[in-house]
Amino acid sequence: MGDFKMAKKPAKKKAPAKKNISKKKKGLTKADVVRKGKQLSNWGKWGKNDELGVLNYIKPKDIVDAAKLIKKGKVFRLGLNLDENGPQNGLFGGRWNPLHHMMATGTDAIAGRQDKTVGLRYADDFINLPTQTASQWDALAHVFAGDKMWNGYDAALVDSTGAHKNGIEKFADKMVGRGVLLDVARYKKKARLADGYGITVNDLNRTAKAQGVEVKRGDFVIVNTGQM
């Protein structure tokens, strides 16, 4: 038989190296917020004319029960000073910190400047401030969902003369109840939480558990961040 040569097997091609592609975790988007908002919406829950929202949960009995919790009669100041050292930096809505102006002073009185006008010596002042520059409650007319605000009212109902629906005056006789302080900064062993830290539901639940308190429907929850 004649000589023959074995055919060489073709060399195996090396598979291209797999790229190590790590999926970047997606952050919260506006679409997420809109979707969740529709899912959890309470619009219409208390009727089409409602302007109170979850304050409807507070009943006279809840206020009476809250009053029974007072033991020591201590009063805690939660307000901010109305002065130029407030929290506003102008980055949102062009807001500024309160400007306190004296219109009449004790030195005016001593100098006799008031005696010939009203015959009364007095001090008087005024404060110039956006309403978001100190301690305050947001009305349901404050933030819009598209062209609507709470309960489906048209955003145009807030005009240059003020809010014709969902104004803060609707809360005047409703903001009474049991207060629960959740000291998240203390739970995290921080004097203050870092700027921009997002407090999660788990943070609130764990803080409440550590403090031995239970947040109930109709409670007013105050969260301490250490920022102020």
Model-identified regions with their sequence ranges:
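Short, Lys/Arg-enriched N-terminal segments with co-localized hydrophobic residues
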Residues: 1-5
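Active-/binding-site microenvironments in catalytic and ligand-binding cores
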Residues: 7-228
